[in-house]
């Protein structure tokens, strides 16, 4: 059985004063080869999305903004247009690679990390959130609140 490091949305448009230090830590974690497999997600936005139309969110529209901010080292990248990374492509990857544990890191704790962690947990995957390798571009206070919320929703032992 393999352990997967799933790096969520470490993209140029999510890098700011709140996330830049966490980005450095994530890069070091990816470079450590501590996990059997590493995969990345990339949020893709456009003018027809609900994010653009309903929230006036214009991030991750350009190729530069969508670009992953660290070297993916030719690991698998899953494109997504919603908060969660859980879709058929990811589930097939998990099954095909005999993955038993999934470790999440990346951005934003309050959105894509939370939604992905809950979705994996609800579908009975063994999921863990690496709290020191996640952050919200809205700041540490938001990050901490959602880490506490995730501990309540998926179990304190799954926040490491």
Model-based region annotation:
Residues 10-18:
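Short acidic, Gly/Ser-rich segments with clustered Asp/Glu that frequently serve as metal-coordination loops
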Residues 6-8:
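Short hydrophobic beta-strand that contains or immediately precedes a catalytic carboxylate
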Residues 18-45:
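A short alpha/beta connector and helix-capping loop motif
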Residues 12, 43-48:
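Short active-site-proximal "capping" loops at secondary-structure junctions
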Residues 1-4, 13, 31-37, 57-160:
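Active-site-adjacent betaalpha module
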Residues 46-58:
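A short secondary-structure junction motif
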